[in-house]
Amino acid sequence: MLTVNSYFDESVKSIGFEQNKNAISVGVMLPGSYTFGTNAAEKMTVVTGSLTIKRSSDADWVTFSSGEFFSVEGSSSFDVNVEIETAYLCEYL
């Protein structure tokens, strides 16, 4: 089953599904600045484009480009700056 979600006035859209009992979502972010909250830990992979993020544990902003990934702790939040349309894969750990 697919679950479609929209966030931030439709500037971020994702499609969620399960694979081998693991929750996954794929989506696209339009240019902008966003703050996401997490319930579970997440592994975010940039499919195309780039994401500049700042987790609470980060001293500075860090940019991740196509093919790179970062992890976010559960029950936390992270800030994202997007300069170009960016596709991502989110695996819930």
From Swiss-Prot:
Top-level class of the enzyme under EC nomenclature: transferase
GO molecular function, one term: thymidine phosphorylase activity
Reaction catalyzed: a purine D-ribonucleoside + phosphate = a purine nucleobase + alpha-D-ribose 1-phosphate; adenosine + phosphate = alpha-D-ribose 1-phosphate + adenine; cytidine + phosphate = cytosine + alpha-D-ribose 1-phosphate; guanosine + phosphate = alpha-D-ribose 1-phosphate + guanine
E.C. designation(s): 2.4.2.1, 2.4.2.2
Domain of life: Bacteria
Record has Glycosyltransferase as a keyword: yes
Ranges that cross the membrane: none
Keywords assigned by UniProt, alphabetized: Glycosyltransferase, Transferase
Pfam families: Ppnp (PF06865)
Signal peptide: none
Cellular component terms per the entry's GO annotation: cytosol
PANTHER family in the cross-refs: PYRIMIDINE/PURINE NUCLEOSIDE PHOSPHORYLASE, PYRIMIDINE_PURINE NUCLEOSIDE PHOSPHORYLASE
Function: Catalyzes the phosphorolysis of diverse nucleosides, yielding D-ribose 1-phosphate and the respective free bases. Can use uridine, adenosine, guanosine, cytidine, thymidine, inosine and xanthosine as substrates. Also catalyzes the reverse reactions.
Family the entry assigns: Belongs to the nucleoside phosphorylase PpnP family.
Protein name per its UniProtKB record: Pyrimidine/purine nucleoside phosphorylase
Source species: Aliivibrio salmonicida (strain LFI1238) (Vibrio salmonicida (strain LFI1238))
